[in-house]
Regions:
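Active-site groove signature of glycoside hydrolases
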Residues: 400-407, 485-496, 500, 506
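An acidic-aromatic substrate-binding cleft motif
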Residues: 352-408
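Polysaccharide-binding surfaces and accessory modules of carbohydrate-active proteins
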Residues: 29-46, 51-55, 60, 74-310
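Short Pro-Gly-centered flexible turn/kink motifs
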Residues: 329-347
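The substrate-binding groove and active-site-proximal loops of carbohydrate-active enzymes
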Residues: 373-384, 405-420, 468-487
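Active-site-adjacent "subsite" loops/lids of carbohydrate-active enzymes
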Residues: 423, 439-495
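Conserved, mostly hydrophobic/aromatic
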Residues: 59, 202, 334, 394, ...
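Single conserved hydrophobic/aromatic residue that forms the stacking wall/gate
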Residues: 1-15, 497-501, 505-509
Length: 509
C-alpha cells in the first residue's frame, strides 16, 4: 500500500544518506585535501631508521629495507589505505655479456600473495646480486634543459617538478665474475610534491678496463596485489610490436612468464597503477602498444603455488619496465648507460572522470611542454611566395605558427647554401610578424635501402608489414649510419636557421 511504499522510500533515502556520509568520512579520514584541487600540503620527504628508508608525500609511499640488501618492502596508496605490494623482487635486473644479475632485492619469501615483517626478517640477499653501498638524498633535477614558450602555455608548471630524489649505489658482489667487478649501478627514484607520482631510472657505469655489453635490463619489477577478478585473461596483441605468432604468450602461460599487451581497459581492471616511460610513442592512441617498455606479466612460477586463482586462471600481476628488444649496448671503460625513465602514478578512484583528471595532471607535471599549444596553419607549398602569404594570413587572424606540411616541398635535409638562405629569409620574415615557422620531416614511411632498413625479428629481413613488425612499410633503422646522418642534418639545419621545428616522427619498427 502507499504507507508501505513511503516507508520503504524513507528507508532507502536513509541508506543513501548513510552511504554518502560513510564515503565522505572515509575520504576525510584518508586525505585532508583533494590533491587534484590543492596538492600543496603533500610535500615529498625522506625518513630513515637504522634499517629502513621511506619516501613519502602523504599520497604515495615507497619503503625500502637497507640490509642485508636494498629492497622495496612496501608500496602504499595512502589515498585509500591500500598496500599495493605483495612480494619482494629485485630493484632491477641486468643481463651483461649474456649473464643475468639482480640488483638489490631479497629472496626466500615463503608465500607470494602477501608480505609481512616475519617474512622479511628471514629473507636473504642473492649471492650474485649487486649489493647496496650507499645512497644520497636531494632535490629533483631536470632530465634535460627545457625553455617553455610562455606565449603558448595554457598551464604553467615548474620544471623540473619539485620533490625529493634518492640515488642508491650498488657494487658487484664479492664473488662476482671479473668482468663486472668494476661495474657500478645506480637506481634513481624521484617522488614529486602534490601528486601520487614517482619516477625511476637506472644507470650502469663501467669503471673497468674492458668493455661490457648490456644485453637487456629490467629497471622496475613490482609484484602487485590483484584488485579485481577477471575470468578471461585475454590474448596479448603484441604481434605488431614484436612480430610474434598469435598465442605466443598465452599458449603455455602456466609454464612461462606471459606478457599481456592488451588494451588499457583490460589492464585497468586489475591495477590502480598508471605506468608510462619516455620510450612511449604514438600519442597513446593504442595505449599498450604505444608504451612498449611497460610489461604486465603473469608472475609464474613464484605465484603459481600460493596465488589466488580465478576460474583456474591468473591475471598478469607483475609489472616490469624493460625494452622489448635489447638494448645490446656496448659500455666502454668510463662510459655510463642511462635507461629509460619509468613514471608511476597511483590512482585513488575507478571512475573514468577522476582517472582522466589525474592523467591530465600527470602530463602537466611530468611533461609540461604538452601544454604548449600554438594555433597553427598548414601551408601546402614551400616556395617563398606561398609561405610568406601564409605567414601574412596567420598574422592577420591571430594564428601563431605556420607549418610547411607533407608534400609541400620542404626538405630539412637539403643543406645547399641557396636553400639555407631562403629558409633563413622565411624564418626572419615569420618572426618579424610574430609567427613561428615549422616543417614536417618524414621519418618512417619513406622507404629505405636494404642496408639501412629496420629488420624483422621474424624473418631476419627488412620488415614491410605489421605482422613483421613495421607500422609504415619498409622503414629506416635509426641505429644505422643513415640514422646518424639524418639526425645530424636535422640538428645542423635547426642550429643554422633557428627554425621552430615540430618534426614528425612517425612510428618506428
Amino acid at each position: 500500500d502507499s504507507s508501505t511504499s513511503r516507508g520503504l522510500g524513507d528507508v532507502y533515502k536513509r541508506q543513501v544518506i548513510l552511504c554518502a556520509l560513510q564515503v565522505q568520512y572515509s575520504l576525510a579520514l584518508n586525505l585532508q585535501k583533494d590533491w587534484l584541487i590543492d596538492g600543496s600540503s603533500y610535500q615529498a620527504k625522506v625518513t630513515t631508521t637504522d634499517k629502513e628508508l621511506c619516501l613519502s608525500n602523504g599520497l604515495l609511499s615507497r619503503t625500502f629495507i637497507l640490509s642485508p640488501n636494498v629492497a622495496t618492502i612496501a608500496f602504499d596508496n595512502l589515498m585509500n589505505g591500500n598496500a599495493e605490494l605483495r612480494a619482494i623482487r629485485p630493484e632491477a635486473v641486468l643481463t651483461i655479456n649474456g649473464m643475468e644479475y639482480p640488483v638489490g632485492g631479497l629472496y626466500k619469501q615463503p608465500v607470494q600473495n602477501f608480505l609481512n615483517n616475519d617474512f622479511i626478517e628471514d629473507m636473504i640477499s642473492c649471492d650474485t646480486a649487486f649489493t647496496y653501498v650507499s645512497h644520497t638524498v636531494g632535490e629533483t633535477i631536470e632530465r634535460f634543459p627545457y625553455r617553455p614558450k610562455q606565449e603558448w602555455l595554457s598551464n604553467k608548471n615548474p620544471w623540473p617538478a619539485p620533490g625529493k630524489r634518492i640515488v642508491f649505489t650498488y657494487k658487484a658482489a664479492p664473488r662476482a665474475p671479473e668482468m663486472i667487478r668494476n661495474v657500478t649501478v645506480k637506481v634513481i627514484y624521484e617522488l614529486y610534491d602534490g601528486a601520487p607520482i614517482l619516477s625511476k631510472q637506472i644507470e650502469v657505469e663501467n669503471q673497468g678496463k674492458s668493455s661490457i655489453v648490456l644485453n637487456s635490463f629490467k629497471s622496475e619489477i613490482l609484484a602487485l596485489t590483484e584488485t579485481a577478478p577477471k575470468v578471461h585473461y585475454g590474448e596479448p596483441h603484441e604481434i605488431r610490436m614484436l612480430a610474434q605468432e598469435p598465442g605466443t604468450y598465452t599458449r603455455n602461460y602456466r609454464k612461462s612468464p606471459a606478457q599481456t599487451d592488451a588494451p588499457r581497459e583490460y589492464i585497468d581492471r586489475f591495477t590502480q597503477l598508471f605506468v608510462v616511460t619516455d620510450y612511449a610513442m604514438g600519442g597513446d592512441m593504442e595505449a599498450m602498444k604505444d608504451n612498449p617498455a611497460v610489461r604486465w606479466v603473469f608472475d609464474h612460477p613464484e605465484y603459481e603455488a600460493t596465488g589466488i586463482r580465478y576460474y583456474g586462471q591468473y591475471k598478469p600481476a607483475r609489472l616490469e619496465v624493460c625494452p622489448p628488444i635489447g638494448p645490446d649496448y656496448e659500455i666502454t671503460p668510463g662510459m655510463t648507460f642511462r635507461s629509460c625513465t619509468a613514471f608511476e602514478m597511483l590512482r585513488d578512484a575507478t571512475d573514468n572522470e577522476r582517472r582522466g583528471l589525474a592523467e591530465c595532471r600527470f602530463w602537466r607535471m611530468m611533461a609540461p611542454w604538452t601544454q604548449e599549444n600554438p594555433i597553427f596553419m598548414h601551408v601546402r607549398r614551400s616556395d617563398e611566395a606561398s609561405v610568406k602569404a601564409a605567414i601574412d594570413q596567420c598574422a592577420a587572424v591571430g594564428f601563431e605558427m605556420v607549418i610547411m606540411t607533407f608534400g609541400s616541398g620542404f626538405n630539412i635535409e637539403n643543406n645547399s647554401p641557396e636553400y639555407m638562405e631562403m629558409m633563413k629569409r622565411l624564418n626572419a620574415y615569420a618572426h618579424s610578424k610574430g609567427i613561428a615557422l615549422g616543417g614536417y620531416s618524414l621519418l618512417a614511411s619513406r622507404g629505405a635501402k636494404t642496408e639501412d632498413a629496420a629488420i624483422s625479428r621474424k624473418t631476419g629481413k627488412p620488415a614491410t608489414t605489421r605482422e613483421e613488425g613495421s607500422r609504415f612499410g619498409k622503414s629506416p633503422c635509426l641505429a644505422s649510419s643513415w640514422g646518424d646522418t639524418y639526425f645530424g642534418k636535422l640538428r645542423s639545419f635547426l642550429s643554422l636557421i633557428h627554425i621552430s621545428e615540430p618534426t614528425r616522427r612517425r612510428g618506428i619498427s
